[in-house]
Amino acid sequence: KMLGVVAKKPMSDYE
């Protein structure tokens, strides 16, 4: 999910 980029969260959120 690209949510990590928008929410500025760690890359772990990508999985």
From Swiss-Prot:
Chaperone recorded as keyword: no
Record's keyword terms, sorted: Membrane, Mitochondrion, Mitochondrion inner membrane
UniProt KW Repressor keyword: no
Membrane topology, from the record: Single-pass membrane protein
Subcellular location: Mitochondrion inner membrane
UniProt record, GO biological process: oxidative phosphorylation
Any one annotated GO CC term: mitochondrial inner membrane
Metabolic or biological pathway: Energy metabolism; oxidative phosphorylation
Functional note: Component of the cytochrome c oxidase, the last enzyme in the mitochondrial electron transport chain which drives oxidative phosphorylation. The respiratory chain contains 3 multisubunit complexes succinate dehydrogenase (complex II, CII), ubiquinol-cytochrome c oxidoreductase (cytochrome b-c1 complex, complex III, CIII) and cytochrome c oxidase (complex IV, CIV), that cooperate to transfer electrons derived from NADH and succinate to molecular oxygen, creating an electrochemical gradient over the inner membrane that drives transmembrane transport and the ATP synthase.
Membership in a protein family: Belongs to the cytochrome c oxidase subunit 6c family.
Subunit-structure text: Component of the cytochrome c oxidase (complex IV, CIV), a multisubunit enzyme composed of 14 subunits. The complex is composed of a catalytic core of 3 subunits MT-CO1, MT-CO2 and MT-CO3, encoded in the mitochondrial DNA, and 11 supernumerary subunits COX4I, COX5A, COX5B, COX6A, COX6B, COX6C, COX7A, COX7B, COX7C, COX8 and NDUFA4, which are encoded in the nuclear genome.
Name this protein carries in UniProt: Cytochrome c oxidase subunit 6C-2
Organism in which the protein naturally occurs: Thunnus obesus (Bigeye tuna)
